[in-house]
Amino acid sequence: MKFTLVATVLLTFSLSAFAVEYPVLTTASPDQVGFDSQKLHRLDGWIQNQIDAGYPSINLLVIKDNHIVLQKAWGYAKKYDGSTLLAHPIRATTNTMYDLASNTKMYATNFALQKLVYEGKIDVNDLVSKYIPGFKDMPGDKIKGKDKLRIIDILHHVAGFPADPQYPNKNVAGKLFSQSKSTTLEMIKKTPLEYQPGSKHIYSDVDYMILGFIVESITAMPLDRYVETTIYKPLGLKHTVFNPLMKGFTPPQIAATELHGNTRDGVIHFPNIRTNTLWGQVHDEKAWYSMGGVSGHAGLFSDTHDMAVLMQVMLNGGGYGNVKLFDDKTVAQFTRRSPEDATFGLGWRVNGNASMTPTFGVLASPQTYGHTGWTGTLTSIDPVNHMAIVILGNRPHSPVANPKVNPNVFVSGLLPAATYGWIVDRIYGSLK
C-alpha cells in the first residue's frame, strides 16, 4: 500500500513537471511595460479626429509582455440605415464584435492547419488532391499543374489561382457561377489557373477556400464546428464565431458594414444580392452566397479581447494557460518568410520589406507578422518586442466615394485611419 502511494505521488509529480503552463493575459498600465503614457494618450485624440471625419468605428487593443496595456473603442457600431444617418447611432464598445474578413484566414483556417500539422494529421507537402478528390487539370486548361499542387503552394499563394473569381456573381463568373457550397467546391476544381504555379505570388481568396475544404476533409467536421469546439472553446473565447446571428448573438452586439448590401450603393447587381444594411452577416460575397457564411477565407466574427488571446497563443509559441494547440516549431514553420517573397509566410503576411509599411508601419521589427481584413481589420504580432496589436473596424459602413468610378472605395477608406501603419507607428512611437 505504501509503495503504491509513493508511486502515485511520484507519477503525479512527474506529470506536473512536464505540464506546460503558458502565460495568460493580464492588464497593466502602459508605464509598467515601457510605454510613455502621455505619448500613447495622444493616440486617443488622433483616432477621435478620424471618427469625427467620418470613419465609422475603431476598436483597438495593444499587448506588451503578456499584458493588455490599451483597450478602447471609438465611434459607432451602426450609424447608417441605408443612406440615412441614424438620429441615435449605436456606439461601439470594447465588446462589439466585428466581421474579421480575411483575418479569418489566419485565426480560423491557419490555426486549424497549424493544429493539424502539429498533431501529425497533415503535412504541408501533401498534394491537395489527397484531400479533395477530383482536384486536377481540366480538359482545355491552358495552364497545367493542379494535380501537382501541394498544400504549401496554396499557403504561399503561389498556386496559380486568380485573386477573386466572384463565384456568386453570374455576370462575372459565367460558367463558374455558384451560390451553394457543394457547387462551389466543384467550381473551384474547374477554376482555370491564371499563371504557372510557383512563378509568382498572387494573394487569392480561392487558396483559402480550398484550405477550408481540406480542414473539413481531415476532421470530418464543418470548419466552424471544428474551430469553435477544438480551438475557441478550450481557450475560453466567447465571441469568436461564424454566422453569429445563428448562434445566439443579436445585431446590436455586432458592427454593421455596407449600407446597401453588396450593391456598392446600387451599382452592382446579381441574383439574390442583399440590398439592406449588413448587420451581423459576413460582408464577403463568396463567403455569404457561395459558402453559406462559413469559408476558409472569410466569415469569422470576433472582438478585441478574443483576438488578443489568439495573438497571445502565437506569442506564447502555441498555447495559452493550460491549453496547447501546437508548438513553437509549428509557429516558426508557418511564419517563416517565403524564399521567393519575404512578405509571405505560410498564410501569414510578414514584415519582410518596405511594401508592408502601410500594414505594419516603419517601427515594427522585421519579424513582425499578421494579416489584414477588407472590412478594416489588422492583426500585428511582433515576437521581437513581445508585442501585438489588433485593430477592428467597419470601414465599409460609409458611403461609396464614387460608385461609377470605383465601387470598392468607401469614403472612410480615403481617411488616414484606413492605413493601419499610421496607428501602428503611433503605438510604437510611444515606447520609451
Swiss-Prot record:
Enzyme class: hydrolase
GO biological process: proteolysis
Domain of life: Bacteria
Transmembrane recorded as keyword: yes
SUPFAM superfamilies assigned to the protein according to its UniProt record, in alphabetical order: beta-lactamase/transpeptidase-like
Localization terms from the record: Cell inner membrane
GO molecular function: serine-type D-Ala-D-Ala carboxypeptidase activity
Pfam families reported in the protein's UniProt record: Beta-lactamase (PF00144)
GO cellular component, as recorded: plasma membrane
Topology within the bilayer: Single-pass membrane protein
EC number, as in UniProt: 3.4.16.4
InterPro entries in alphabetical order: Beta-lactam-related, Beta-lactam/transpept-like, Diverse_Enzym_Activities, Pept_S12_YfeW/YbbE-like
Name of the protein described by the UniProt record: Putative D-alanyl-D-alanine carboxypeptidase
Catalytic activity: Preferential cleavage: (Ac)2-L-Lys-D-Ala-|-D-Ala. Also transpeptidation of peptidyl-alanyl moieties that are N-acyl substituents of D-alanine
TM annotation in the entry: 7-25
Keyword list, A-Z: Carboxypeptidase, Cell inner membrane, Cell membrane, Hydrolase, Membrane, Protease, Transmembrane, Transmembrane helix
UniProt keyword annotation of RNA-binding present: no
Family of this protein: Belongs to the peptidase S12 family. YfeW subfamily.
